Design a protein with these regions (language model features):
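N-terminal glycine-/serine-/threonine-rich phosphate-binding loop
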Residues: 2-8, 30-83, 379, 383, ...
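SAM-dependent methyltransferases
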Residues: 2-48, 270, 274-348
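Conserved phosphate- and dinucleotide-binding cores of soluble alpha/beta proteins
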Residues: 55, 59-60, 73, 122-321
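Glycine-rich N-terminal segment of FAD-binding domains in flavoprotein oxidoreductases
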Residues: 73-105
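Short internal beta-strands
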Residues: 112-119, 251, 284-289, 434-437
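Glycine-rich phosphate-binding loop and adjoining beta1-alpha1-beta2 segment
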Residues: 112-114, 118-150, 442-462
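Residues at the starts of beta-strands that form the adenosine-phosphate
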Residues: 112-114, 150, 246, 282-284, ...
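Active-site rim/loop-helix segments in enzyme catalytic domains that contact anionic ligands
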Residues: 342-462
Length: 462
């Protein structure tokens, strides 16, 4: 089913999570086909913000875009403005692409929409490649019928002496528009929403802020080096964001999983600005399987209670998952895990499923992992000595040699990330092709290339 969430948590009218309602299936695992999976009712005691997990980021983006479209149409039917708070970056990009499609194919009008963007680097020319102003125009504003006067984006060119007054006017403009009906948010590795870095106060308003080093490191690739990333930005404050009537935070990808866990299951602390969403009566977090992987209901579902109570069982997948988790937690080899280790870490139920206790579990998991290790990444040739040409080797290949395509984001990622596998495939007779997804020419500044060319020219003359 399109845009179908895997699992969701709901919130009461006062913003505190209610117990999750099971929708069938197995909790604590992700759907391979996009169907709904209900989490444990006990997860609501751990997750302090309502969370919905979709089978893919594209499904999640379409669902959020549909919600925005419904808000716009509802407001238009009452001759009212829909006031949206917007975010930038790769996370909401899919939402904007879907909104553009709805405008072009289904006639969704943005004539009654007023927008306020969360933030902008400072200083920043609005036409620069890294400008959020340019981003919004390229991905949304230039493709819809929104009125130019209804677009509000922090000005990265305002002089330092005028920044305070600009921020004050930005706050007043939001209030004059009637406040934000819906605020879209992303989350950074530091837990920032907007550019509200660790330490931001709950009642902070739109202001100039100094960026955290982690934030600047994460933006380095966009600026061709960390040293080129602006050190400051203008951002809506936490208080400004929490003043919106509804908040929707999106996070996709495994690199967001750890900070999502802190924001959703941890306490409200200024060091994780996103945790303040726990105090909002109508906030939600939208995730894909990768970004939800660290949540208790997915990573350690046994911590929520008996597995059978929420449709789970101790099958091979969950047994391996638990043993690996325990080994990593205790920093012990799997074969050295003891009955006491399992007992003391909430895995008594798993222990009781094996007559030999920890020994049986350890051997089972160790052997399953051992089978995945091979010196033949493309599979071994079949055994020509057998009448059927088959082999009893678990790594035997039905097709040998293979035609292999390696997709590499940049011209060096293939050898850096999988050089050993690459050379094994070639040495073992497979036909290997590499598809580079960018030429790499934009990864180097023009002046750096010219400087190197000048050096080579002078060197050759000598």
């Amino acid at each position: 089913m399109a845009n179908q969430p895997i699992s969701a948590a709901s919130a009461s009218s006062n913003g505190h999570p209610r117990a999750h309602v099971s929708t069938g299936g197995m909790a604590g695992s992700h759907s391979a086909h996009g169907g709904p999976i209900g989490p444990s009712p006990l997860a609501g005691h751990i997750e302090r913000i309502p969370v919905t997990v979709y089978s893919s980021s594209s499904d999640a983006s379409r669902a959020v875009a549909a919600e925005i479209a419904e808000l716009i149409r509802s407001k238009a039917s009452r001759r009212q403005k829909a006031v949206l708070g917007l975010a930038t970056g790769s996370t909401p990009q899919g939402v904007y692409e879907e909104l553009v499609r709805l405008h072009r194919e289904e006639g969704l009008s943005f004539a009654n929409v007023v927008t306020f963007n969360l933030d902008e680097y400072w200083p920043m020319d609005p036409t620069a490649l890294q400008s959020y102003n340019r981003f919004m125009r390229e991905y949304l504003f230039d493709h819809i019928d929104i009125r130019p006067e209804n677009i509000h984006i922090p000005d990265g060119t305002v002089p330092m002496k005028d920044v305070h007054d600009f921020c004050d006017r930005y706050e007043k403009a939001i209030a004059a528009a009637g406040g934000l009906d819906l605020q879209i948010l992303g989350i950074g590795r530091t837990g920032h929403v907007g550019f509200n870095e660790p330490g931001s106060a709950r009642d902070s308003r739109t202001r100039l802020i100094t960026l955290d080093r982690v934030t600047r490191m994460d933006a380095a690739s966009d600026f061709f080096g960390e040293w080129n990333v602006p050190r400051k930005a203008i951002t809506m404050g936490v208080g400004t964001i929490l003043s919106a009537r509804k908040l929707v935070l999106l996070a996709f990808g495994e690199h967001k999983a750890s900070i999502i866990k802190r924001a959703v299951e941890g306490p409200v602390v200024a060091q994780v600005a996103a945790s303040f969403l726990q105090e909002h009566p109508a906030s939600r977090i939208i995730l894909d399987p990768a970004s939800s992987a660290e949540l208790t209901r997915f990573k350690t579902p046994w911590a929520l209670g008996p597995m059978e109570a929420f449709g789970q069982k101790w099958d091979a997948h969950n047994t391996k998952k638990a043993a690996i988790w325990l080994a990593r937690t205790l920093e012990k080899p799997i074969l050295k895990l003891t009955d006491e280790d399992y007992n003391e870490h909430g895995l008594q139920e798993l222990l009781s499923t094996r007559e030999g206790g920890a020994y049986d579990i350890n051997i089972e998991v160790f052997r399953s992992l051992q089978k995945t290790i091979t010196g033949w990444p493309g599979g071994r040739p079949t055994d020509a000595g057998r009448p059927d040409g088959r082999s009893t080797d678990v790594h035997a290949a039905g097709v040998f040699p293979k035609r292999v395509v390696v997709f590499s984001p940049h011209p060096d990622d293939d050898v850096i990330s999988m050089g050993g596998t690459f050379i094994r495939l070639c040495d073992q007779g497979h036909e290997v092709h590499v598809a580079y997804q960018t030429s790499g020419n934009i990864a180097v500044w023009d002046d750096a290339a010219v400087r190197h060319a000048d050096f080579v020219t002078e060197f050759c003359r000598e």
